[in-house]
Amino acid sequence: MSLDHRIEVPTNFRRIGLLTRRDGQPVQVPFFARLLESAALAEVQDIHQEALRRVPEPGLVRVDSEAFFAHHFNGEGHTLGVFAGDRLIAYGILGLPAGPDYRYDRFLEDLGLPASEWNRMAQLIGVAVRPEWRGNGLHRRLCEWRLELAHVVHRWQVAAVSAPGNPYSWRNLLAVGLRIKGVKWLSGDQLRYLLHADLRGSSSLDPASVVTIEVSAMAEQRRLLAAGYWGYAAAMEQNVLRLRYARPLPP
């Protein structure tokens, strides 16, 4: 039986907290987070465009269309927003595909999951924070909150992608429990880690199998992933960013 996420996602979802940094300076500004309605489309796009203008190199952040954002207000997903006062300062999109006709990211197929899992699939497919409010942990919180919503509606299979050159993104995804299980190309020329978690639980990792690899060593990472290893943690060694991989233990 498929799930009607439009009914089951709790529209009264709220989170509150305190922002402690603005433009790198200490502040104390309350924030609240809630689900957005389609009237916020222009503000969400504005934050997205601001993020695109500030990426250090092209391709680290995907350029998403107005139709993409609109679909995840009124179609197969929801968008969380974070407000400081009445100003939207961050958003995170939770994609909830209804089935194989979903028009956007098809992570179920990338992961090799069976078609019967479409109605158990949740996708973390867009997040951005206004530059002056970075440093408050909002990116990670938006990951955590979207996982909460996925759990509520029994969307156990959670997936996301992140550019290897965007460690801020993939480190947050690893921190909330996703694991690197593959690599893929977006639009033919944008390399991405493919991350996944099953919220019902997954195998522990074998500590005897741990391998640490430079993030830039993509061929070696591909070899490990093909051999069944999962990327699970970042490590800084000799001022070089690396990833730790390990094999999952048998169930």
PLM region spans:
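Conserved acyl-donor/pantetheine-binding loop and adjacent beta-alpha core of acyl/acetyltransferases
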Residues: 89-126
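Conserved acetyl-CoA-binding loop-helix of GNAT-fold acetyltransferases
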Residues: 126-129, 135-150, 175
